[in-house]
Curated annotation (Swiss-Prot):
<keyword id="KW-0547">Nucleotide-binding</keyword>
<comment type="subunit">
    <text>Homohexamer.</text>
</comment>
<feature type="binding site">
    <location>
        <position position="17"/>
    </location>
    <ligand>
        <name>ATP</name>
    </ligand>
</feature>
<dbReference type="Pfam" id="PF01467">
    <property type="entry name" value="CTP_transf_like"/>
</dbReference>
<dbReference type="GO" id="GO:0015937">
    <property type="term" value="P:coenzyme A biosynthetic process"/>
</dbReference>
<keyword id="KW-0548">Nucleotidyltransferase</keyword>
<dbReference type="GO" id="GO:0004595">
    <property type="term" value="F:pantetheine-phosphate adenylyltransferase activity"/>
</dbReference>
<keyword id="KW-0173">Coenzyme A biosynthesis</keyword>
<feature type="binding site">
    <location>
        <position position="9"/>
    </location>
    <ligand>
        <name>substrate</name>
    </ligand>
</feature>
<feature type="site" description="Transition state stabilizer">
    <location>
        <position position="17"/>
    </location>
</feature>
<dbReference type="InterPro" id="IPR014729">
    <property type="entry name" value="Rossmann-like_a/b/a_fold"/>
</dbReference>
<feature type="binding site">
    <location>
        <position position="41"/>
    </location>
    <ligand>
        <name>substrate</name>
    </ligand>
</feature>
<feature type="binding site">
    <location>
        <position position="103"/>
    </location>
    <ligand>
        <name>ATP</name>
    </ligand>
</feature>
<comment type="pathway">
    <text>Cofactor biosynthesis; coenzyme A biosynthesis; CoA from (R)-pantothenate: step 4/5.</text>
</comment>
<protein>
    <recommendedName>
        <fullName>Phosphopantetheine adenylyltransferase</fullName>
        <ecNumber>2.7.7.3</ecNumber>
    </recommendedName>
</protein>
<comment type="function">
    <text>Reversibly transfers an adenylyl group from ATP to 4'-phosphopantetheine, yielding dephospho-CoA (dPCoA) and pyrophosphate.</text>
</comment>
<dbReference type="GO" id="GO:0005737">
    <property type="term" value="C:cytoplasm"/>
</dbReference>
Amino acid sequence: MTTAFYPGSFDPITNGHVDVLVQALNVAEKVIVAIGIHPGKAPLFSFEERAELIRRSLAEALPGKTGDISVVAFDNLVVDAARTHGATLLIRGLRDGTDLDYEMQMAGMNRTMAPDIQTIFLPAGTASRPITATLVRQIAAMGGDVSAFVPAAVLQALTSKRPN
């Protein structure tokens, strides 16, 4: 069974992330969504909240297929975490050329450290190309409508985080 590792902060998961996950299930039988935990960062959502939002978003987007997806935390090198979970593929979403430049550097470094793990680039769909979790958080914090950019569960969670 081919297992893919999809690392990110997912703070919060966006429609772009969901798009990449749907594509990832076309190249791997199992996908591990890996939430990076960085002690120096203060995320909007806790690990537990992000994991639950991922599960709820995927249940909505992929009814009946969520058994092929698991959610874990990691705080070490991506390749080490992927190896720990038995993954042989790293999934990376690409929105534009800037993402490609950065991701090619990372893929090269990861390949040197872990030649047994291959990076797969999956292009974002047209509708999700402009979406970033950072922009979603900023727009939501200013009271903007982010419903076109995030799953319903995330929209509800963002709304509840916003002060009245």
